[in-house]
């Protein structure tokens, strides 16, 4: 569920945050 954009969100959560948080 990890997207290429999750590189930024991974700093906030884990890496799957894009699925939950935009």
Curated annotation (Swiss-Prot):
Q: What is its main location?
A: membrane
Region described as Disordered: spans on this chain: 1-22
* Keyword Cell membrane attributed: yes
Cellular component, GO, one term? plasma membrane
Keyword vocabulary terms for this entry: Cell membrane, Membrane
Q: Does the keyword Membrane apply?
A: yes
Cell location: Cell membrane
Give the function comment from the record. Binds various plasma and ECM-proteins.
Q: What is this protein called?
A: 65 kDa membrane protein
